[in-house]
Amino acid sequence: MFTVFLLVVLATTVVSSTSGRRAFRGRNAAAKASGLVGLTDRRPECCSDPRCNSTHPELCGGRR
C-alpha cells in the first residue's frame, strides 16, 4: 500500500511539473499509471479473468 502511495505522489509531481499541452498529456499518463497501480493490487484476480488478462497483458507477463 505504501508503494501505491509513492507511485501516486510521483505521478502527481510529474503532472504538476509540466505545462501547456504537455501537462494534458502528462495527466493522461498519470491517470493510466494510477489505473495500473490499482490493477496491480488485483493482479491474481485479473490474470485469472480472460477479459482482464487480454485488456492488461502487461500485468500477467503478456505482450504489450
From Swiss-Prot:
Name a GO molecular-function annotation.
toxin activity
Q: Which UniProt keywords apply?
A: Acetylcholine receptor inhibiting toxin, Amidation, Disulfide bond, Ion channel impairing toxin, Neurotoxin, Postsynaptic neurotoxin, Secreted, Signal, Toxin
PROSITE patterns xref list? ALPHA_CONOTOXIN (PS60014)
Its subcellular locations are:
Secreted
Fetch the Pfam families from UniProt: Toxin_8
Recorded hits in InterPro entries, A to Z, give: Conotoxin_a-typ, Conotoxin_a-typ_CS
Q: Point out the propeptide residues.
A: 18-43
* Signal peptide interval: 1-17
Q: Which pairs are disulfide-linked?
A: 46-52, 47-60
Cellular component, GO, one term: extracellular region
Show the segment(s) annotated as Ser-Xaa-Pro motif, crucial for potent interaction with nAChR.
Answer: 48-50
Tissue-level expression reads: Expressed by the venom duct.
Residues recorded with modification Glycine amide: 61
- State the similarity comment: Belongs to the conotoxin A superfamily.
Record note on domains: The cysteine framework is I (CC-C-C). Alpha4/7 pattern.
Q: What else is known?
A: Negative results: does not inhibit high voltage-activated (HVA) calcium channel currents in rat DRG neurons (at 1 uM toxin).
Outline what the protein does: Alpha-conotoxins act on postsynaptic membranes, they bind to the nicotinic acetylcholine receptors (nAChR) and thus inhibit them.
- Name by which UniProt lists this protein: Alpha-conotoxin-like Ai1.2
Organism of origin is Conus ammiralis (Admiral cone)
